[in-house]
Swiss-Prot record:
Keywords attached to this entry: Amino-acid biosynthesis, Aminotransferase, Histidine biosynthesis, Pyridoxal phosphate, Transferase
Database matches in CDD domains: AAT_like
Descriptive protein name: Histidinol-phosphate aminotransferase 1
Biological process, per Gene Ontology: L-histidine biosynthetic process
Superkingdom per UniProt: Bacteria
UniProt-listed InterPro entries: Aminotransferase_I/II_large, HisP_aminotrans, HistidinolP_aminotransfase, PyrdxlP-dep_Trfase, PyrdxlP-dep_Trfase_major, PyrdxlP-dep_Trfase_small
Residues annotated with N6-(pyridoxal phosphate)lysine modification: 217
Gene Ontology molecular function, alphabetical: histidinol-phosphate transaminase activity; pyridoxal phosphate binding
Organism lineage string: Bacteria, Pseudomonadati, Pseudomonadota, Betaproteobacteria, Burkholderiales
Pathway in which the depicted protein is active: Amino-acid biosynthesis; L-histidine biosynthesis; L-histidine from 5-phospho-alpha-D-ribose 1-diphosphate: step 7/9
Cofactors (names): pyridoxal 5'-phosphate
Positions of disulphide bridges: none
Natural source organism: Burkholderia lata (strain ATCC 17760 / DSM 23089 / LMG 22485 / NCIMB 9086 / R18194 / 383)
Length: 357
């Protein structure tokens, strides 16, 4: 009798599924979500819009009106195309699949977004991780050396980086782009609503650079919509491996509606940036903590005992992310999503109970 073990790849059999904890009843500060719902009148208007969606029809594979609205709203440079994905994760998978020649490699700073490595390995690409410096800034010399040695097909630069919050220096990125002429440079701006800089306006300057974004961190994580901006030469090829109906009709309608109300989402992002500053100051004042600078909607914090702090917060019904086992540079670190003022107050109260002194 045939079993899964007879058919499925050995590396897949050795894997575990990506863990997503049940957050029911918790203050949920583990996944970098916007804590704010839509204002009630806007939510009601969206509901009316969604009630008109033809659920019996397949979605438009390339929704022209939505793409045009997205280009205008996000300031996509002339000469660039836009490719939609079911979240950034699908775009990463499409790029991995399209670039998966025998012996090809993917390179990224580590610690970084886990999907770069996971997607590469699923496409049977070799992943090369280049450690950050001890202060979690980019080790440019190590990156340049690794690029010269490995000649990767894809180089990912998260801008800012998750889970560290680091916003790499533009001059350093320019050096990497110049050195990696044989590579595709993917600048991942998932957390751009909380950063002060963007590479999107420069996407047309370089023939080997694409910029990836998502609407998740802006406040729309539930609709799973990511987009890639870059040269038509690249996006035409990636479009060939895109599932034909990958963006469902409800996601398309929601995005089309809310792109007309970006002022609401931008105001929420501004509130979260202010909360980030306040929260960082208050956490840094707690005994035994080190708060790393962050340009995202989260804080990376080193504590005396990450596992103990994580468990103590769970007892107080506050869920954060213990990242201390992800990489040696993250030893005794937890990642705290910036929540609403009330959520942050509960987090601070729980941290005061969890930290000795």
């Amino acid at each position: 009798m045939t079993t899964p073990q007879d058919i499925i790849r050995r590396d897949v059999l050795a894997m575990t599924s990506y863990p997503v904890p049940d957050a029911s009843g918790f203050v949920k500060l583990d996944a970098m979500e916007n804590p704010y719902p839509l204002p009630e009148p806007l939510a009601a208007a969206l509901g009316e819009r969604l009630a008109q969606v033809a659920l019996n029809r397949y979605p438009a594979p390339r929704p022209a009106a939505l793409l045009d609205k997205l280009r205008h709203a996000m300031g996509v440079p002339a000469g660039c195309e836009v490719l939609l994905g079911n979240g950034s994760d699908e775009i990463i998978s499409m790029m991995s699949m399209a670039c998966a020649k025998p012996g090809a490699k993917v390179l990224a700073p580590v610690p970084g977004f886990v999907m770069y490595e996971l997607s590469a390995k699923l496409a049977q690409l070799e992943f090369v991780g280049v450690p950050l410096k001890a202060d979690l800034t980019l080790d440019v010399d190590a990156m340049l050396a690794a690029i010269a040695e490995h000649r990767p097909a894809i180089v990912y630069l998260a801008y800012p980086n998750n889970p560290t919050g680091t916003l790499y220096d533009d001059a350093d990125i320019e050096r990497i782009v110049a050195a990696a002429r044989h590579s595709l440079i993917v600048i991942d701006e998932a957390y751009q609503p909380f950063a002060v800089r963007s590479w999107l306006p420069r996407a047309a300057e370089f023939d080997n650079v694409v910029v990836m974004r998502t609407v998740s961190k802006l406040g729309l994580a539930g609709i799973r919509l990511g987009y890639l901006v870059g040269s038509p030469a690249w996006l035409t090829e990636f479009d060939k491996v895109r599932p034909p109906y990958n963006i469902n009709v409800l996601t398309q309608a929601t995005a089309d509606f809310l792109l007309d109300h970006l002022d609401v989402l931008d105001a929420q992002a501004a509130d979260l940036r202010a909360e980030r500053t306040r929260l960082a100051q208050e956490v840094a004042a707690l005994p035994g903590t080190t708060v790393f600078p962050s340009a995202g909607n989260f804080l990376l914090v080193r504590v005396p005992d990450a596992a103990a702090v994580f468990d103590a917060l769970l007892t107080e019904r506050v869920l954060v992310k213990n990242v201390s086992k992800m990489h040696p540079l993250l030893a005794e670190c937890v990642r705290l999503t910036v929540g609403s003022p009330d959520e942050n107050a509960r987090l601070l109260a729980a941290l005061k109970l969890a930290l000795p002194g």
